[in-house]
Amino acid sequence: MSETTETQNTAGLKLNGLFAFKEGMATIYNENGEAVPVTVLRYEPWFVSQIKTNEADGYEAIQVACHPKKAKNSNKAEKGHLEKAGFENGAQFVKELRQAAPEGTVVGAQISIDSLAKGDFVKITSKSKGKGFAGSVKRWGFAGGPASHGSKFHRRPGSSGNRTWPGRVMPGKKFPGHLGAETVTVKNVEVVQIIAEENVLMVKGPVPGARNTLVKLVRE
């Protein structure tokens, strides 16, 4: 690894977390020769776009942005807000990390991949795979009805009614509907490896979502 490449990827602002994109799963081997299943995450340059404070915003956070937009896809307000961060036409992703800004933090600073280190345990938040419309058996794990002996009740939800009161189906009742595509959080996930020169992070086990899903990692 050249000195220039190392500086480019590791220099920058270190926060208590970062955002990355899911690539897929792989298997690596640790020092004891044991196979470890990992999810490979692709890190791309994120820049500070706003510093939020208790006085001005009511809470402390660092807003970060990534992926420049095309001019035709952005509006004037977006351009004005993100121009100082280096995004003339806005950004595809604008997210926040809830923490106080480290000393010396300025708008436009790049977030370092070294915000996390090997051995850290993180809380991961991402969007699960969408599976379309699903019945109550697949979506909620309903047992279903008899499979044979003349039964005509197999995978239907069954009765959803109540009594004279309330005389309606209560909100939140488990019914068929859209499965997946929900925000999912997984805690205590170990960072197995960070390859700064390739902008790659590896975390132990699976991570919710399809390939290229945006993943938020926050140190616990």
Curated annotation (Swiss-Prot):
One of this protein's GO BP terms? translation
What segment(s) does the record annotate as region Disordered? Answer: 145-169
Gene3D superfamilies, from UniProt?
3.30.160.810, Translation factors (2.40.30.10)
GO cellular component terms, alphabetically, are: cytosolic large ribosomal subunit
Q: Name one Pfam family in it.
A: Ribosomal_L3
> What SUPFAM superfamilies is this protein classified in?
Translation proteins
Which Gene Ontology terms cover its molecular function? rRNA binding; structural constituent of ribosome
InterPro entries membership = Ribosomal_uL3, Ribosomal_uL3_bac/org-type, Transl_B-barrel_sf
What's in the keyword line of the UniProt record? Ribonucleoprotein, Ribosomal protein, RNA-binding, rRNA-binding
Q: Could you give the subunit structure recorded for this chain?
A: Part of the 50S ribosomal subunit. Forms a cluster with proteins L14 and L19.
What is stated as this protein's family in its record?
Belongs to the universal ribosomal protein uL3 family.
> What this chain does, per the record?
One of the primary rRNA binding proteins, it binds directly near the 3'-end of the 23S rRNA, where it nucleates assembly of the 50S subunit.
Report the protein name in the record: Large ribosomal subunit protein uL3
Q: Which organism is it from?
A: Bdellovibrio bacteriovorus (strain ATCC 15356 / DSM 50701 / NCIMB 9529 / HD100)
